[in-house]
């Protein structure tokens, strides 16, 4: 969205303008915390947030960006003297000084969202957020001008950045919302103020922070605020009734839309030359998704019911589903150098692993099967049990070789004496990859699964 510097000053009480007063009328429309995102086509319109992270201090790139041609910066007050020095050499610069760069980003997003007229849709849940977002965006785009969160900008930093990147003239905006610590959803809900909320499911994820499922359900439910008009909920989830009550407390007139599976019939699954299609009939109309996994049909039904409620026709919905562009690393089927590869390396929790198990059963692979499992993170006290369960589930799936990467798996091996001949343990990726290369056999089916932390997509490099 386009905004004048003078309006940014209104968005927060904790911001100080440093620059020539005439530049207060300057307009910005591209917002970034990553200097690499600033290119020739957005230099003149950029506002760079010089955020100090755990590894990199964004202020260290300010001089480089000034030389590149960027004019506007949000910086910590501790850098005021340096900013003034830069300003003495270039009076066209604007510095917005604040005690907390990220809080300024969040305040600006909250301020600007109030200026928009589009319907704000929030999608959250333990699994399926990104896939559901992509499907709903593709469907709505068949009839309405629609925006979506790009990538997985869904956190206390990513969501406000995603909000700032809308054009402002959309009819619907679909935002993915994720949490990794207690209280994060309070903040995200206050920033976004969604009118339509979809909760895909409640299952084990981020257990280090939340300890138990009830705590996850409570945290996720905080996305439901007083602005809610429509609530879409999976009626198969154990917390459906609880979430529905929360929605009705927030707004007694809220419209409830269910993931209703009574009228669902899975017609066929086809897999040919690395391409697949799930065909199903729902409420008498035939749909298809080009994505592996029956659980994705369930998420598609949530999107279908919401789209129908919003006045879309079945034909439009069908076209939107079939045209959905899905992200890499999420149930992605690849054929490389004669190998069939199922790459599900982006997300690691027990719920997504069980969904993966069903995908593999649907594929009905007759060739030899290898699986590479990277350890799952943020499990807290459940880490040991989860990794033990993972090993046992993998064994039950009759893989010919199971490659396990991470100290968590080694702990289970040593305590449980799990040393079956199909199991191969490695403390880290670098110790695994050479052994894996030597283990490959022609035409083997390879499954890759792990947390984003593991960066298991690096395996794909050996097939190029």
Swiss-Prot record:
Residue numbers binding ATP: 125-131
The keyword RNA-binding is assigned to this record: no
InterPro entries referenced in this protein's UniProt entry, alphabetically: Mur-like_cat_sf, Mur_ligase_C, Mur_ligase_C_dom_sf, Mur_ligase_cen, Mur_ligase_N, MurCDEF_CellWall_CoF430Synth, MurE/MurF_N, UDP-N-AcMur_synth
Pathway: Cell wall biogenesis; peptidoglycan biosynthesis
GO cellular component: cytoplasm
One Pfam short name: Mur_ligase_M
Cysteine pairs bridged by disulfides in the record: none
Residues that span the membrane, as ranges: none
Compartment(s) of residence: Cytoplasm
A Gene Ontology biological process term: cell division
Keywords, comma-separated and alphabetical: ATP-binding, Cell cycle, Cell division, Cell shape, Cell wall biogenesis/degradation, Cytoplasm, Ligase, Nucleotide-binding, Peptidoglycan synthesis
GO molecular function: ATP binding; UDP-N-acetylmuramoyl-tripeptide-D-alanyl-D-alanine ligase activity; UDP-N-acetylmuramoylalanyl-D-glutamyl-2,6-diaminopimelate-D-alanyl-D-alanine ligase activity
Catalytic activity: D-alanyl-D-alanine + UDP-N-acetyl-alpha-D-muramoyl-L-alanyl-gamma-D-glutamyl-meso-2,6-diaminopimelate + ATP = UDP-N-acetyl-alpha-D-muramoyl-L-alanyl-gamma-D-glutamyl-meso-2,6-diaminopimeloyl-D-alanyl-D-alanine + ADP + phosphate + H(+)
Enzyme nomenclature, EC number: 6.3.2.10
Function: Involved in cell wall formation. Catalyzes the final step in the synthesis of UDP-N-acetylmuramoyl-pentapeptide, the precursor of murein.
Family: Belongs to the MurCDEF family. MurF subfamily.
Name recorded for this polypeptide: UDP-N-acetylmuramoyl-tripeptide--D-alanyl-D-alanine ligase
Species in which this protein is naturally found: Borreliella burgdorferi (strain ATCC 35210 / DSM 4680 / CIP 102532 / B31)
């Amino acid at each position: 969205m386009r905004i004048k510097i003078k309006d940014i000053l209104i968005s927060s009480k904790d911001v100080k303008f440093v620059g020539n007063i005439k530049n207060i009328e300057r307009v910005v429309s591209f917002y970034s915390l990553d200097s690499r995102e600033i290119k020739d086509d957005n230099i003149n319109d950029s506002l760079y947030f010089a955020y100090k992270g755990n590894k990199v201090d964004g202020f260290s790139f300010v001089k480089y960006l000034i030389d590149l041609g960027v004019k506007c910066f949000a910086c910590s007050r501790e850098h005021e003297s340096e900013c003034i020095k830069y300003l003495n050499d270039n009076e066209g610069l604007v510095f917005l000084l604040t005690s907390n760069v990220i809080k300024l980003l969040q305040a600006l997003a909250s301020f600007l969202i109030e200026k928009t007229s589009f319907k704000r849709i929030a999608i959250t849940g333990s699994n399926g957020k990104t896939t559901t977002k992509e499907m709903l965006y593709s469907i709505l785009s068949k009839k309405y001008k629609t925006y979506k969160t790009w990538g997985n900008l869904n956190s206390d930093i990513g969501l406000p950045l995603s909000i700032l990147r809308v054009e402002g003239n959309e009819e619907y905006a679909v935002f993915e919302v994720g949490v990794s610590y207690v209280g994060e959803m309070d903040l995200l809900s206050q920033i976004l103020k969604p009118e339509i909320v979809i909760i895909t499911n409640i299952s084990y994820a981020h257990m280090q922070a939340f300890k138990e499922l009830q705590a996850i359900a409570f945290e996720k439910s905080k996305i439901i605020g007083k602005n809610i008009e429509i609530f879409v909920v999976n009626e198969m989830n154990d917390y459906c009734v609880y979430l529905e009550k929360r929605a009705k407390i927030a707004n007694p007139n809220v419209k409830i839309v269910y993931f209703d599976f009574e009228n669902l019939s899975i017609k066929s699954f086809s897999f040919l030359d690395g391409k697949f299609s799930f065909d199903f009939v729902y409420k008498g109309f035939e749909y298809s998704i080009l994505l592996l996994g029956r659980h994705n049909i369930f998420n598609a039904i949530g999107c279908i019911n919401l789209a129908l409620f919003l006045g879309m026709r079945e034909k439009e919905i069908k076209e939107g589903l079939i045209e959905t562009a899905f992200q890499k690393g999420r149930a992605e089927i690849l054929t490389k150098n004669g190998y069939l590869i199922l790459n599900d390396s982006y997300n690691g929790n027990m719920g997504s692993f069980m969904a993966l198990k069903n995908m593999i059963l649907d594929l009905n692979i007759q060739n030899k099967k290898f699986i590479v499992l990277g350890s799952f993170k943020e499990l807290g006290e459940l880490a040991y049990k989860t990794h033990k369960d993972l090993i046992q589930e993998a064994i039950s799936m009759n893989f010919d070789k199971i490659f396990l990467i991470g100290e968590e798996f080694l702990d289970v091996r040593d305590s449980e004496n799990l040393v079956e001949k199909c199991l191969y343990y490695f403390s880290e990726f670098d110790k695994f990859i050479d052994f894996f290369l030597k283990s490959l056999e022609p035409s083997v089916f390879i499954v890759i699964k792990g947390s984003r932390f593991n960066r298991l997509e690096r395996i794909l490099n050996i097939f190029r």
